[in-house]
Regions:
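Glycine-rich phosphate-binding loops that contact phosphosugars or nucleotide phosphates
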Residues: 1-89
Length: 94
């Protein structure tokens, strides 16, 4: 799963590590899921399922994208099927 603001860009050499990882995933026939900001960049181009966070304010693309991504990864980490251990604060007595 790719969490990125721009999603990588081959031409402008932005986040080349993401580009290489995506190419490797494609070469191995893996499913690519991404949550990205802006237009999604390379992740949007080659990904199988990609959510592009809408731009609300050009000056806040990074924090809006990362905030949305944080909600998703916390939901994944807290999902009962995926959770290995309970969340700390949910297990603390009042």
């Amino acid at each position: 799963c790719v969490f990125s603001v721009g999603g990588g860009d081959v031409v402008r050499n932005i986040s080349p590590n993401i580009v290489v990882a995506l190419d490797e995933a494609k070469a191995r026939n893996l499913t690519i899921i991404g949550i990205v900001g802006r237009d999604g960049g390379y992740t949007k181009k080659v990904g199988d399922v990609v959510i592009v966070v809408p731009v609300v304010d050009e000056n806040l693309i990074t924090p809006h994208s990362e905030a949305f991504q944080a909600v998703i990864w916390h939901a994944l980490a807290s999902h009962p099927v995926l959770m290995i251990e309970k969340n700390k604060w949910e297990g603390v007595e009042s």
